[in-house]
Structures are given as C-alpha cells and as structure tokens.
Amino acid sequence: TAAIPTVDFHGYLRAGVGVSGDGSEAEWQKNKLGRLGNESDTYGELELGSEVYKKDDVSFYLDSMVSMVSDGSNDNETTLNDDAQFGLRQLNLQIKGLIPGDPNAVIWGGKRYYQRHDLHIIDTKYWNISGSGAGVENYTLGPGAVSLAWIRGDANDVDYRVDGDSNVNINYIDLRYAGWKPWSGSWTEFGIDYAMPNTTKKQDSYGGLYDAENGVMLTGEISQDMLGGYNKTVLQYANKGLAQNMVSQGGGWYDMWNYVNDATGYRVINTGLIPITEKFSINHVLTWGSADDITDYTDKTRMLSLVARGQYQFTDYVRLIGEVGGFYQKDSYNNGTSYKQAGEKYTIALGLADGPDFMSRPELRIFASYLNDSEDGKPFEDQTANNTWNFGVQVEAWW
C-alpha cells in the first residue's frame, strides 16, 4: 500500500460556559429565535480526507468525519455513564474524471453530508438529505449542472411493538439542477426529493403507521448579489411524511411517527447578508411555514420566524454583535381547539475574531441574552417562569 502524500484536515467546533437565571445556561427554540447566546452544548466535527490517486483528469478522493456532542458539564465526558455521544458522519469515495466530456463531474458512494443548504444564524439546514448513498453530481448540462443521488434515511422505533422490527427502511431519490443565472448577479437551484418508505412483509401486516406512502419535497431558490452581499429566496412544497419539515425547520426527514398520508405543506424563506457600511452589516432569516394534517388530530399548523444579527467592527479583530429573534406558531386541531407558541430573544455580545468578515472564524464571544415566552408556556426555571437570561462565553470555529 502506497503512503498517502497529503491529508486534508477540516473541522468545526463550538464550546463554552454559561449560566442562566436558574442554574446552567438555557437553550430554547434556537432554530426559530436564533442561536447567538442560545446554545448550551459542546459540539465538534473532525474531518480527514485525501486524494489517494491522481493521474491526468482522474482523481480518487477518500473522505471521513466523526462528530461529538455533550452538554459540557464536566472535565472528562465519556460515553460511559455520561452524556457524550460520538457519531460517524461521513465515510465516502469521490471519483472525478471518469465521465466522458466532463472531467469535473463526480461519481460518489458511501456516507456523506450531501449538498446541505444552511441558515447559519438559526443553525438550520432547510435542504438536507444526507446519509449513506451513491450518485453522480455536478454533471454539466446547459448553463448549469445536474446531480442525482440515492440516499438512505431510515425511521427508527416507529412504535413500541416487541414482536418484530420497528425500524423502517426509507430511500430517497434526490435530483437537483444548479447554476442557471437568469440575469447578471443571480444564481438559482431547483430540486426534487422523493422519499420511499420500504417496509418488510411483516411490517406491511401491522398496518397503521406502517402504511406510510411515498412523499415528495420540491425546492426552488434564487439568489442575487446585492450591495456587496446577497439575498436569497427559497420556495418549498412537501407532502406525506415530508410535510412537517415546512413548520419544524427541518431539511427533509420523513415522519413515520404520525399518520401523515394526507399531509401537505409549504415554506417561504428569505435570507441575506447586507453590508450597510464598511464596518456594519446585517444577516437575517425570515421563515413562513404552513402545513395541514401533519398528525391524525392536527388540522392546520402555521409558523412565522424572523431573526436578524447585526455586527459592527471596532477593529479588524474586535466586533460588537447584536441578535434579535421572534417567532409565532399556531396548531389548530380537528376538535376546534388550538395551541399557540410564541417568543422573543435579545442578545448582545463582544466578539473577538480572526478578521473583519461577518463569517470570520475562529471567534470568541462574551454574551448576554434575554429569552421570553410570550404565550405563558413557562419553559424556564423548572417550568415556573416565562422568561430568563443567559450570560456566558462561547467559541466557534471552522477550518
């Protein structure tokens, strides 16, 4: 076996320490209110990859990644009687140069993060069909490129039966077209994801939740260069087990735990990063989601979320950061009742980063946050309070 000449090392981390008005730092609805000053975990990803073969236009690249998550509460956090969890996130082979006429097209197989679309300030991937699979991506077709993948994303523990397997095999066909530019400074991407629950004969005999039907999610997005930044609008439609993603800030997981064969939903997202001045910029995410019949007792669910993060650079390395978020969600039930959720978050932070760009990392932040449940849900202080505060220090990095 020949020695591998070079190894690419990439990763991500976030970690810190904080307190709230009642004990350790609180985390509440961060995917709808914003993540700044609203994260209480320790999380990391370590990725190693290498081009193990290269000749002319032909390249074989191996990639791997493991992840770790814990609550950061102790010195030595292990998987034995502690809360640390380790995961295998990526392990795949990517081959270039074997498709005639398109040396940049990729044939791949294995386990991987697959073309995930991220809303960073709310820590959400709104288009995320990742897992074990295979496919061809970035094959040039007209003004853009097409990608086709088969990816597995099973549903586990569908119910509590003990007389058979409660894990259901689900396969996705993911088809995307990206790169078409309808006018100067714009770019687009379109895709269809088709999810197919693949039950066994024994599971078919159970009926009920195991009678789930194939579902579809359609995504279209257009982005535009704007004032030195960008703006993006996303439209999505989903049905069956994929419909709940439209109101849960999900990216494409299939719900097998509810009766969803009549479910439909749609979502509109607008996001952007705009430099207002040379030193001040704003990143925002607006989400409106609607879904019907996502459980056997739910009629309609509506969700609205708006988060904005502003950043002012004092120097190349020191910045003031503010983040404001709010959301409203209403679940209307078939019996005529409803359940409302709503809240706000306000955060101010001093950031120390390795450059003046909005997304410059690594970054250390000293933050203070106020969180409020405006629908009297009492999620804080052992379910006795509608609001609380956080104070702490967090670091975040990717490389």
Segments predicted by a language model, with ranges:
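Short loop/turn motifs that connect adjacent beta-strands in outer-membrane beta-barrel proteins
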Residues: 1-9, 49-62, 98-106, 140-147, ...
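Short proline/glycine-enriched turn/loop segments at secondary-structure junctions
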Residues: 278-280, 336-338, 356-357, 380-384
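Detector for outer-membrane/organellar transmembrane beta-barrel domains
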Residues: 175, 180-333, 342-346, 352, ...
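A broadly tuned preference for mixed-charge, low-complexity surface segments
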Residues: 50-59, 66, 118-121, 156-172, ...
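Surface-exposed coil loops of outer-membrane beta-barrel proteins
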Residues: 16-36, 76-84, 89, 101-208, ...
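Transmembrane beta-strands of outer-membrane beta-barrel pores
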Residues: 15-21, 66-70, 111-115, 150-156, ...
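Beta-barrel outer-membrane channel/assembly domains of diderm bacteria
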Residues: 1-102, 137-139, 273, 309-312, ...
